[in-house]
Amino acid sequence: MMDDTRHPTRPYPEQQQQPPGQTAEMKPVPDHGEKSYKGAGKLIDKVALITGADSGIGKAVAIAFAREGADIVISYLNEDGDARDTAKWVEEAGRKALVIPGDIKSEEHCRDLVQRAVDELGGIDILVNNAAFQRTYGDITDISADEWDETFRTNVHAPFFLSKAASPHMKPGSSIINTTSIQSRQPSPQLLAYASTKGAISNFTAGLAEMLAEKGIRVNAVAPGPIWTPLIPSTMPAEKAAKFGENTLIGRAGQPAELAGAYVLLASDLGSYMTGAVVPVTGGEIMI
């Protein structure tokens, strides 16, 4: 385990929330880069649509993109307070924030998200398919068909719906970034449904990269390890949430801010020779 005094260390207090969870109720509150991220003009006047941008990784990416010069569509389910806070940080960076609640399991809503980005912000240059649903289970017999379907519709169908709707509006040089997971390569049995969707997203990324290459649209993914977001205390038993991330080489859960740079890389000209790639940010866990 590595010593790191800049970030909260384990164990965290035992805690549990109702899904999808609220940032303000977490102990410690995640770091989204509010104080630490410094932009360098890598995304000047770009428009980015980010799902799950109200909290966690999506919030950190929204803050980073805004500080790099992008306007942001903040897509979220119903966590209004968290979404307003993200919008505040985007606007403090001098950029526009378009806040749109709704269920991305609906293809109609996904089409509306893209159309509003085009109509109200002038286009779409970056799509970040980040929102996800997960639950833990002790046995396959504990997983209902409805929960299996909800996991796939949120984690797999929605990125398909959004990529399908967005790609006709995207110019050469645009970028689609999917959030997969170390679970795509090292599935935990307790996360059977979630891990299955993340394996699907890794393959979706590779296939879509080939499909859109002739249009000049790059498609990549980021594979986080254990990251401290509202998803954790709202979907895991309290005792597991307290120890979350302790088995990594870093010895702790990652903070959302620690992933933002990977998304900036893939969204910007720094990643212009990258497509079909999966970038691991795992705290030292090896993706086999």
Regions found by a protein language model. Give the residues of each.
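The beta1-alpha1 cofactor-binding region of Rossmann-like NAD(H)/NADP(H)-dependent oxidoreductases
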Residues: 80, 101-114, 145, 257-258
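Residue(s) in the substrate-gating loop at a strand-loop-helix junction
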Residues: 181
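Substrate-binding pocket helix/loop in short-chain dehydrogenase/reductase
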Residues: 138-140, 144-149, 244
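Short C-terminal tail/terminal secondary-structure segment
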Residues: 4, 26, 34-35, 137, ...
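C-terminal substrate-recognition "lid" of short-chain dehydrogenase/reductases
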Residues: 121, 169, 252-281, 286-287
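Active-site helix of classical SDR
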Residues: 163, 197
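Alpha-helical segment proximal to the catalytic Tyr-Lys
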Residues: 168, 210-214, 272
